[in-house]
């Protein structure tokens, strides 16, 4: 063969390898509209995606590229966030008011992101206004690649279950209440996949199982404020995954699931073939709320028993029970996640802490209106997304960094309304302590990262409490609960450049200021660390019409 032919063949081989090596793309077109729904039997305006509530399920595989073209047919600006997706180098697609201009009514926007080096159970939902109270949410499941071993046999099927509290008031009414300075109060009920039912009501089954087979149930709590407890009538649950981590496979009769959290369990259909109830009940509310759904055996005979499994205790005893359950959630050190190497090959407990950030939540009246905040700052969104302001070098016109200190002020209950942006040094390993001095539970989520949940304890934190940390097999996750009059500790490396939202997952509190943004800048301004602004990214506010900055280079 001549040298020219050899060169040509070699070039073809290189090109074919390049094509094969690119990860697959999945494309979705979503039409976001209003529609009448009645989760608790009261007709109200809901937010539908392609006519569905809950919305369409995204089923993908680790490293897939996801392309979602969203058409906003509402009468208000709208955004989706992809809760738990890390968006490596790409906070442009995170879908929060601090990173993106909203999709205006009658307009569309195409999200493009990669589920890089992730597996697990996640969700998407609206971040604008109080839209989450009207629906607009759904599942985002990331499966392991074919060559990566999974620490359990393939289930017969997978089912996504969205649970949480619900309000009969519409999202615009709820927003008006908050804008008027009042709380939205107690929810009206609990829903399961957009519906509710009581024992004895004739309802279609939520899911069907075949006797002798095992099923994977992916649960997410996308309510507004209430923790819930999940239990199957007559069927124990084997916990196998929580927010992207394979867990030690303990067996549970019931599981607490806090707002914003997702987990996976295996349930085996090994009982008498008939109907059984899935029970979801509220936690830590003065007046308990609950709902049931029917799980039916194929070819089964007989209704579900009216005798429901006993819920866990409430009040102080219930908090201790739930805290102990948290401690039982541990990382499966020998299992692989998105990569072939075992999860336990990352020894987070041996890394030196470079910074400790203590965060106190509080509530207060500001100008006669209810506000929530962190370390004395109640966050407010400006007219321009923070990421755009920073990228265009216009921060002096929009916000000041580090108004919030790493320690709580002497009187954290005194709140100042301001844009809350903290600098974080790229690739530093940090410890974040959450202290909750309130009488109600909190849950917090950090975009762009998974962190190690090393402790949840009663009382107040002090450096001596580090001896209680789990430095070996704490779960890598993206959401942490903080019980009343308790604290929680997480550890992470700020190795993902971008602008990332730390927020309460209880949307009333988020809307009224209980959130902040971490600015994580790479000093090299290199494409190795962060992507340039996408070509289709809309500009708004003070950066609209400005010349584009010099792009990052490889």
UniProtKB/Swiss-Prot annotation:
This is L-ascorbate oxidase homolog. Induction: Expression regulated by the haploid gametophyte itself. Glycans are attached at residues 31, 59, 108, 332, 352, 423. Residues 22-143, 196-296, 411-521 form the Plastocyanin-like domain. Belongs to the multicopper oxidase family. Residues 1-21 form the signal peptide. It comes from Nicotiana tabacum (Common tobacco). It is an enzyme of class 1 (oxidoreductase). GO terms for molecular function: copper ion binding; oxidoreductase activity. It comes from the Eukaryota. Pollen. Pfam families: Cu-oxidase, Cu-oxidase_2, Cu-oxidase_3. Coiled coil: none annotated. Probable oxidoreductase that may be involved in pollen tube growth.
């Amino acid at each position: 063969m001549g040298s020219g032919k050899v060169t040509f063949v070699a070039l073809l081989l290189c090109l074919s390898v390049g094509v094969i090596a690119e990860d697959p793309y999945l494309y979705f077109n979503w039409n976001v509209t209003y529609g009448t729904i009645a989760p608790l039997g009261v007709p109200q305006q809901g937010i539908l995606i392609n006519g569905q509530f809950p919305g369409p399920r995204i089923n993908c595989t680790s490293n897939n590229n996801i392309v979602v073209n969203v058409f906003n047919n509402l009468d208000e600006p709208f955004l989706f966030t992809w809760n738990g997706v890390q968006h490596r180098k790409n906070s442009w697609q995170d879908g929060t008011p601090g990173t993106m201009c909203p999709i205006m009514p009658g307009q569309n926007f195409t999200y493009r992101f990669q589920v890089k080096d992730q597996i697990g159970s996640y969700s998407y939902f609206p971040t604008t206004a109080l839209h989450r109270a009207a629906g607009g949410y759904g599942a985002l499941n990331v499966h392991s690649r074919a060559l990566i071993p999974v620490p359990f046999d393939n289930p017969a099927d997978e089912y996504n279950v969205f649970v949480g509290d619900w309000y009969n008031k519409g999202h615009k009414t709820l927003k008006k209440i908050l804008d008027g300075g009042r709380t939205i109060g107690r929810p009206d009920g609990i829903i399961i996949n957009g519906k509710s039912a009581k024992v004895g009501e004739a309802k279609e089954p939520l899911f069907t199982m075949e006797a002798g087979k095992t099923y994977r149930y992916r649960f997410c709590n996308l309510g507004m404020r209430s923790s819930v407890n999940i239990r199957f009538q007559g069927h124990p649950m084997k916990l196998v995954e929580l927010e992207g981590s394979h867990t030690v496979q303990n067996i549970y009769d019931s599981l607490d699931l806090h707002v914003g959290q997702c987990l996976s369990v295996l349930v085996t259909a090994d009982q008498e073939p008939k109907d059984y109830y899935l029970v979801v009940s509220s936690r830590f509310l003065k007046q308990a709320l609950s709902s049931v759904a029917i799980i039916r055996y194929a070819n089964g005979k007989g209704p579900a028993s009216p005798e429901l499994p006993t819920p866990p205790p409430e009040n102080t005893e219930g908090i201790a029970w739930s805290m102990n359950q948290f401690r039982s959630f541990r990382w499966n050190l020998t299992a692989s996640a998105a990569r072939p190497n075992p999860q336990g090959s990352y020894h987070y407990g041996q890394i030196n802490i470079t910074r400790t950030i203590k965060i106190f939540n509080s509530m207060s009246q500001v100008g006669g209106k209810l506000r929530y905040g962190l370390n004395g700052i109640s966050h407010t969104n400006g007219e321009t997304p923070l990421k755009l302001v920073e990228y265009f070098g216009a921060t002096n016109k929009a916000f000041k960094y580090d108004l919030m200190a790493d320690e709580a002020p002497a009187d954290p209950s005194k709140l100042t309304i301001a844009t809350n942006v903290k600098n974080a040094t790229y690739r530093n390993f940090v410890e974040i302590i959450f202290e909750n001095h309130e009488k109600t539970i909190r849950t917090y989520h950090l975009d762009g990262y998974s962190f190690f949940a090393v402790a949840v304890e009663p009382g107040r934190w002090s450096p001596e409490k580090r001896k209680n940390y789990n430095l070996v097999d704490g779960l890598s996750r993206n959401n942490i609960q903080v019980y009343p009059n308790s604290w929680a500790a997480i550890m992470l490396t700020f190795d993902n450049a971008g602008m990332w939202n730390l927020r309460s997952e209880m949307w009333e509190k988020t809307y009224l200021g209980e959130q902040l943004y971490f600015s994580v800048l790479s000093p090299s301004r290199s494409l190795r660390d962060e992507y340039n602004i996408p070509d289709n990214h809309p500009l708004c506010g003070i950066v609209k019409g400005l010349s584009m900055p010099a792009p990052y280079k490889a």
